[in-house]
Amino acid sequence: PGYSPKGPGLGWHFGYFSFGDIAEKQIANDPNLFFSYFIKTYAGKKDIFTPELLAELIEPYSTRDKLKAAFGYYRSKKDSALQNEALLANNKKLFIPAMALSGEKGVNDVLIKEMRAKFVEDPAKLEAVILPNTGHWLIEENPEGVEKSLSKFLFK
């Protein structure tokens, strides 16, 4: 997901965050500048991200050490992908009920389709929910929808 005529692909940040410590060095001086843009770019409801909420969300990324810890997730993606490939090669899929929760204005059904096609033994056991008018930040943008969906799934 690089750059297209529509702009950068949705996953551009995966490579950026995982490439050594460049992202940490660039972002650490002004995490508010970067993350305010980043959060709003992936939001379906941009107006809910007030300066106060943004400050609360950005604080955990406010130092270089915190950024390094956070971006460790992206650095581990290569190992995770290799582990998933090995499991799938041995036909190891989820056999328990599973849930995929996404936002309509986020990745919509992209990950749901992938999960259904690759990672679950019985696609009928996958509870797939796309929250309407919601971007990537599900809990901030649609707390009621998340709570309702999780409760329905967990307390069947």
Show which residues each predicted segment covers.
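Catalytic active-site module of serine/aspartate enzymes centered on a nucleophile-bearing elbow/loop
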Residues: 123-156
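Flexible "cap/lid" subdomain of the alpha/beta-hydrolase fold that forms the substrate-access gate
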Residues: 1-130, 151-152
